[in-house]
Amino acid sequence: MHEEVQCGIDEAGRGPVIGPMVISIVCCKEEYLREIGVKDSKMLSRKRREYLFDKITKNCAYSYVVVSPETLNKDMASESLNKIEENYILELLSKAEGIVYIDCFDVIEERAEKYIREKSGKEVVCKHKADSIYPAVSAASIVSKVIRDREIDKIAEKYGFFGSGYPSDPRTIDFLRKAMQQGLDLRSVARIHWETYKKIKEDVESGQKKLF
């Protein structure tokens, strides 16, 4: 009996102020992915993600791209985050055949789906929460999250603990403020176009001016 191969694309690290965004594609037998128990990476412990990552990368076709903060800083001077993500998705789609399911990054699913279909010539389905619906998208979310976690570990080794890297994390905010007060150049690890970054930088600079 023919086993259906499913392809999915998902990202990790779209919203943080620190660290890269990772976008992955996984093509694999749907039955196998269900057997090993893939699900949205946010619902899994790091240990479980690492275990599933090993299974996925040994038994499925996959590819990923790490979009560094430096690249995001450069590209976001002229393009939106949605457009940047679209461009990398188009790059990954060139490796796929058949229908590809994508965890939708746009608030309007139809708009993203139409654009990607027209630009790639591929049949795609863009859906919000696709990582909870399609096993291949769940697998892609796991690959993206594991790769990003490893990149975050490298940053933490160099700069010390900074929390999750998300703007909602007080530990991340505290790290950014102290690093800026010390005059550290964070452009290789932080996203300078994020409002969080701009606000902290403004506060630190205005505080320093008051000292003189």
Swiss-Prot record:
Keywords: Cytoplasm, Endonuclease, Hydrolase, Manganese, Metal-binding, Nuclease. Its EC number is 3.1.26.4. Manganese or magnesium. Binds 1 divalent metal ion per monomer in the absence of substrate. May bind a second metal ion after substrate binding. GO terms for cellular component: cytoplasm; ribonuclease H2 complex. A divalent metal cation binds at D10, E11, D103. It comes from the Archaea. GO terms for biological process: DNA replication, removal of RNA primer; mismatch repair. Its main location: cytoplasm. Residues 4-206 form the RNase H type-2 domain. InterPro entries: RNase_H2_suA, RNase_HII/HIII, RNase_HII/HIII_dom, RNase_HII_arc, RNaseH-like_sf, RNaseH_sf. The keyword Metal-binding applies. Pfam families: RNase_HII (PF01351). It is found in: Cytoplasm. It catalyses: Endonucleolytic cleavage to 5'-phosphomonoester. The keyword NADP does not apply. Its cofactor is Mn(2+); Mg(2+). It is an enzyme of class 3 (hydrolase). GO terms for molecular function: manganese ion binding; RNA binding; RNA-DNA hybrid ribonuclease activity. NCBIfam families: ribonuclease HII. HAMAP family: RNase_HII_A. Belongs to the RNase HII family. Endonuclease that specifically degrades the RNA of RNA-DNA hybrids. This is Ribonuclease HII. The lineage of its organism: Archaea, Methanobacteriati, Thermoplasmatota, Thermoplasmata, Thermoplasmatales.
